[in-house]
UniProtKB/Swiss-Prot annotation:
It catalyses: (7S)-salutaridinol + acetyl-CoA = (7S)-O-acetylsalutaridinol + CoA. Optimum pH is 7-9. Belongs to the plant acyltransferase family. Expressed in root, stem, leaf and capsule of the mature plant. Restricted to sieve elements of the phloem adjacent or proximal to laticifers. The lineage of its organism: Eukaryota, Viridiplantae, Streptophyta, Embryophyta, Tracheophyta. Optimum temperature is 47 degrees Celsius. Keywords: Acyltransferase, Alkaloid metabolism, Transferase. Acetyltransferase involved in biosynthesis of morphinan-type benzylisoquinoline and opiate alkaloids natural products. Catalyzes the conversion of the phenanthrene alkaloid salutaridinol to salutaridinol-7-O-acetate, the immediate precursor of thebaine along the morphine biosynthetic pathway. Conversion of 7-O-acetylsalutaridinol into thebaine is spontaneous. The active site is at H163, D416. This is Salutaridinol 7-O-acetyltransferase. Disruption phenotype: Accumulation of upstream metabolites, such as salutaridine, but reduced production of morphine. It comes from Papaver somniferum (Opium poppy). It comes from the Eukaryota. It holds the Pfam family Transferase.
């Protein structure tokens, strides 16, 4: 049995980084939106970007580590525009923006980046601040950054942002803005031109989705899934594993599914995310014990689905989850599908029809988000009440809930601090709550999808077995 790789980790320093200029008095109170209120304060999402030592500096005394002061100064400039991130949370209603600052760790990793990354189960938690790894540790800073410096000159930058104030799109915008500011500062750009104007956020979520008084009280918050801080216990046997779906396999499945699509969806080719989501659903369907029904909750970015659409740089949580499921007794029983399935159908065709049905249902639920205003309001109401994510039974059948979040097409592999593009970008899946959760991200080529899956140990073994069987079958 392979031994778990463990690098010696030494925390060199911890600092507080504040905005370069004070936040104006009229911006000192940043109101949360209704959607912000629905996310837990303790849940931080760590994004890790790996940058190898470049050829130009790998043989000399200068390397990425010499840029630490530049990283800090550019981060300070970036916080001027992302000022709520440097504030402190008050009573699930607003952020006190008196420039309290974010936490910044400088860490030395004894070993080479290539050795660290070559492990079958990469120990990503070693690159995170301890206060992020443990959900039960109280935190004040809404953003925690750790710069990990390897002996070889490579660097892994970990940015952890509280989900209370930011979704995946906002987290991506923040890191891209910081990198752009660093790169421009390195080349001698003027202070006024340091930040890419296209990456300056807009703050309109609270006006679009006003906060709820109900969600400021303990009783109101208790209705929201994940609102209570999870305990760190030795009994928690949740494990995480990385799965990579390459472009060739995704394309093969997509072409087979396209033939089956109903007429009203023919013009909409399945996306990579839809294909992989359907494969995940089918695998958990096979892994789910008899008498239970798996329900998949998929995060949906509202920005482009609003009327009129919002900017990509709109700050905050502008995402909801939509829920999709297919009871085993009704899978592949629609009239359209019955015409093509008969007693001689191969098992692979049956599975493809099931994937087709699931994608059709998921699209139908997502279409409600971008439909009329009333439909969108109902989706948001269900999300804010915790109804969708806390489903217990459907038609008297016990439900097992699964959550999927996609970071695809967010430009994470384009993030350049002046060292070139990262060789790997990933999300640490081990932050609680993580049981039955999936994180999707692009592979480096931009065509495949990397998935981090988290299950209890026994469930992981079942999921892995069934996923491999399905991929081999179709």
């Amino acid at each position: 049995m392979a031994t778990m790789y463990s690098a010696a980790v030494e925390v060199i320093s911890k600092e507080t980084i504040k905005p370069t200029t004070p936040t104006p008095s009229q911006l000192k109170n940043f109101n949360l939106s209704l959607l912000d209120q629905c996310f837990p304060l303790y849940y931080y999402v760590p994004i890790i970007l790996f940058y190898p030592a470049t050829a130009a500096n790998s043989t000399g005394s200068s390397n990425h580590h010499d840029d630490l002061d530049l990283l800090k100064s550019s981060l300070s400039k970036t916080l001027v525009h992302f000022y709520p991130m440097a504030g402190r949370m008050i009573d699930n209603i607003l952020v006190d923006c008196h420039d309290q600052g974010i936490n910044f760790y400088k860490v030395k990793i004894r070993g080479k980046m290539c050795e660290f990354m070559s492990q079958p189960d990469v120990p990503l938690s070693q690159l995170l601040p301890s206060e992020v790894v443990s959900a039960s540790v109280p935190k004040e800073a809404l953003v925690i950054v750790q710069v990990n410096m390897f002996d070889c000159g490579g660097t892994a930058i970990c940015s952890s942002v509280s989900h209370k104030i930011a979704d995946a799109a906002t987290m991506s915008t923040f890191i891209r803005s910081w990198a752009s500011t660093t790169k421009t500062s390195r080349s001698g750009g003027s202070t006024a031109a340091v930040t890419d104007q296209k990456l300056i956020p807009s703050f309109d979520s609270a006006s679009l989705f006003p906060p709820s008084e109900r969600l400021t009280s303990p009783s109101g918050m208790s209705e929201i899934p994940f609102s209570s801080t999870p305990e760190d216990t030795e009994d928690d046997k949740t494990v995480s594993k990385r799965f990579v779906f390459d472009f060739a396999k995704i394309t093969s499945v997509r072409e087979k599914l396209q033939v089956l699509m109903h007429d009203n969806y023919k013009s909409r080719r399945q996306t990579r995310v839809e294909v992989v989501t359907s494969l995940i659903w089918k695998s958990v369907m096979k892994s789910t014990p008899a008498g239970f029904l798996p329900v998949v909750h998929h995060a949906v970015n509202l920005r482009k689905k609003m009327d009129p659409p919002l900017q990509d740089v709109s700050f905050g949580n502008l995402s909801v989850t939509v829920s999709a499921f297919l009871p085993a007794t009704t899978t592949t029983t629609t009239n359209a599908v019955n015409k093509t399935i008969n007693s001689t159908s191969s098992e692979s065709q049956v599975v493809l029809h099931e994937l087709h049905d699931f994608i059709a249902q998921m699209r139908s639920e997502i279409d409600k988000v971008k439909g009329d205003k009333g439909s969108l309001e109902k989706v948001i109401q269900n999300f804010a009440s915790g109804h969708d994510a806390s489903i217990k039974k459907i038609n008297d059948v016990e439900v097992i809930n699964f959550w999927i979040s996609s970071w695809c097409r967010m430009g994470l592999y384009e993030i350049d601090f002046g060292w070139g593009k990262p060789i790997w970008v990933t999300v640490d899946p081990n932050i609680k709550p993580n049981k039955n959760c999936f994180f999707m991200n692009d592979t480096k080529c931009g065509e495949g999808i990397e998935v981090w899956a988290s299950f209890l140990e026994d469930d992981m073994a079942k999921f892995e077995l069934h996923l491999s069987e399905i991929l081999e079958l179709i």
